[in-house]
Amino acid sequence: MDIHKLTEEEANEINTWTYEEPYNLYSFSGEKEVMEELLDGTYYGCCDDQGDFIGYFCFGANAQVPGGRDAHLYGGEGVTDTGLGMKPALTGKGMGKEFFQAGIAFATKEFNAKMFRLSVATFNTRAVTLYKNIGFKQGPIFLSRGREFMLMEYERPSA
């Protein structure tokens, strides 16, 4: 997989993505402000081995959920907050593990990341199962915009 700074073309595509219920909270609005965030340098596009754009990763504060920030859950040194999204047509097709592991490997190399943290809606059992299978551990649960989220953390084994 190829992971690279998100291009404007990829950002435009992401900004049209809509997901079916109950995953629609991950849908994009198409607003100009969203484009500005997608192109602020913290987002990375991911293409499969055929060169097709399949999803994105973001690292840092943009991967944090507002309710978790309000609850002061994002402290700590050396923790890389991680967000990701896969093209809606590709979700639930068994590609998530390879996709997400590619993002972890990229952040490890690019940022020397050792500890990863993500926020996931608790109803999203597909994602929670994937993250647990990779080695993420469940952390605190919090509310954000009326929905329940969970922090999960993963410490990369030393080489």
Question: Which residue stretches match the model-derived regions?
Answer:
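Conserved GNAT acetyl-CoA-binding A-motif
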Residues: 109-119
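Conserved active-site alpha-helix within GNAT-family acetyltransferase domains
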Residues: 97, 122-140
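Short hydrophobic/aromatic beta-strand or adjacent loop that forms the aromatic wall/cage
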Residues: 41, 147-152
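Conserved beta-strand-loop-alpha-helix junction that forms the acyl-donor binding cleft
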Residues: 117-128, 144-149
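Conserved acetyl-CoA pyrophosphate-binding loop and the N-cap/start of the following alpha-helix
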Residues: 90, 94-103
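Acetyl-CoA-dependent GNAT
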Residues: 8, 16-89, 110, 142-143, ...
